[in-house]
Swiss-Prot record:
Induction statement: Expression is highly induced in the dark.
Domain TCTP: residue ranges: 1-168
GO terms, molecular function: calcium ion binding
Keywords recorded for this protein, A-Z: Calcium, Cytoplasm
Name of the molecule in the record: Translationally-controlled tumor protein homolog
């Protein structure tokens, strides 16, 4: 299995168990998330249900909750929304911190395409949710989520050049 770590914080963000689509010349990865129910346990011991009162809830609280698979799997932490000025400031700082960590070829592709990716994200700014990895480091890569028109499951956007592939 391949896991992709944030180059700046080392947090695990996506893995190859979630397929992605490249956007903006490979600068952004789009990954489809899903709402899943977690914690619901239905125990069937195979006994006679009518004798045991199968229709009765005997005070069992299984605390089933709905979570987004990607957020839960990688322990992403939601952050407050950004306005346009804050977002542009974040992107400038991110580019400044990430560029020295890239190889020459990767740096060239990143610099040539990050402006288009930033404009794309700015166009969706009011619809985006912002997440960071579990370390919640200050200068880290962000994961962006939004809902496509009519979708019930969120779509996540990753800045691909800020990810390092690690085999598990």
């Amino acid at each position: 299995m391949l896991v992709y770590q944030d180059l700046l914080s080392g947090d695990e963000l996506p893995s190859d168990s979630f397929s992605y689509t490249e956007l903006g010349n490979g600068v952004l990865w789009e990954v489809q998330g899903k709402w899943v129910v977690q914690g619901a346990v239905d125990v069937n011991i195979g006994a006679n249900p009518s004798a045991e009162g199968a229709d009765e809830d005997e005070g069992v609280d299984d605390q089933a909750i709905k979570v987004v698979d990607i957020v839960d799997t990688f322990r992403l932490q939601e952050q407050p929304s950004f306005d346009k000025k804050q977002f542009v400031a974040y992107m400038k700082k991110y580019i400044k911190n990430l560029t020295p960590k890239l190889g020459a070829e990767q740096e060239e592709v990143f610099k040539n395409n990050i402006q288009g990716a930033t404009k794309y994200l700015l166009s969706k700014l009011s619809d985006l949710q912002f997440f960071v990895g579990e370390s919640m480091a200050d200068d880290t890569g962000m994961v962006f989520a939004y809902y496509k028109d009519g979708a019930t499951d969120p779509t996540f956007l990753y800045l691909a050049h800020g990810l390092k592939e690690v085999k598990c």
